[in-house]
Amino acid sequence: MLKFTLHKKDGYARRGTLELNHGKIETPVFMPVGTYGSVKAMNPQNLHDIKAQIILGNTYHLWLRPGLEVVEQFGGLHGFIGWDKPILTDSGGFQVFSLSDMRKLTEEGCTFKSPINGDKLFLSPEISMKIQTVLNSDIAMQLDECTPGEATREQARKSLQMSLRWAERSKKAFEDLKNPNALFGIVQGAMYEDLREESLKGLEELDFPGLAIGGLSVGEPKPEMYRMLRAVGPILPEHKPHYLMGVGTPEDLVYGVAHGVDMFDCVMPTRNARNGWLFTRFGDLKIKNAKHKLDKRPIDESCTCYACQNFSRAYLHHLHRAGEILGAQLNTIHNLHFYQVIMAEMREAVEQGKFADWQAQFHENRARGTD
């Protein structure tokens, strides 16, 4: 089940509601990443507290461990991990194709060795759909070939054509399995605008209920990523949700929304938090730096998260230096809360027709830097 309602547009920025089997999502939305079925350093109550509306699970990793036979006993991923709101799962393709020296790609699918025990495994569109059906995620993704950013035009064309054939197979398998959830297609084409348009045209013929932009933030220069966003975002079908995969910084989210993106995921806020890199309204803060040793202020005096309301920079500095788990937890709560606040503010700005003003103020504040 998927119903997308577009409430308001301000330029290309959009404000909508996405209705899924496990609840409604207000867009634009950021999805914290729970690779192994948990968002690192967060429990489900923490996620509720920061107002996370949907999280992402990783098909590849959950397939390998704990395995489908375990998740199936709980009726799907929601029951297994104790999360009652929507979940999106990726197809597993990105992780498999990252194993470049351990995998073999054919039209049928991809053969690879398990990095856990060396077992020979095979992932195809049909198997990916089977896995995601067992996981019972609210949004599943087609299996696609993740084209590297530096691909030649001919490589990119062959890759996107394979992805389109796999999209058709994914959709058929999804329907044959009578999966009651939603399946998104993925626009590929590397850094070639005309190939992106070719990919989009093929996906539109398959009539997926939502579309994602894949193959960005895979090593290409930032200006190239933004060029592709400018080219693809505004031409995605207006009546369907638009998902930018694996992106990114706070500035990337704002740029994406400005060019028609509704959904984002990225490990950056959680990974950076564990490394002591904190995002604030006035730039980024490295809590491990010695200057915070005696600082009684919170991370961000305007922030309402649990970490900022209760603890000083000095304490967080100490926790990070000591390698305490609590430090990673508090840092992660803050970073994910900050991302959720950005999204909420963008939703409100679009509703009020003031997105451009909000965007300008956001960049001005971020450029100021922290003290």
Curated annotation (Swiss-Prot):
GO terms for biological process: queuosine biosynthetic process; tRNA wobble guanine modification; tRNA-guanine transglycosylation. Substrate binds at D90, S91, G92, G93, F94, D144, Q188, G215. Coiled coil: none annotated. Binds 1 zinc ion per subunit. Pfam families: TGT. Pathway: tRNA modification; tRNA-queuosine biosynthesis. GO terms for molecular function: metal ion binding; tRNA-guanosine(34) queuine transglycosylase activity. Residues 246-252, 270-274 are annotated as: RNA binding. It comes from the Bacteria. GO terms for cellular component: cytosol. Homodimer. Within each dimer, one monomer is responsible for RNA recognition and catalysis, while the other monomer binds to the replacement base PreQ1. This is Queuine tRNA-ribosyltransferase. It comes from Neisseria meningitidis serogroup A / serotype 4A (strain DSM 15465 / Z2491).
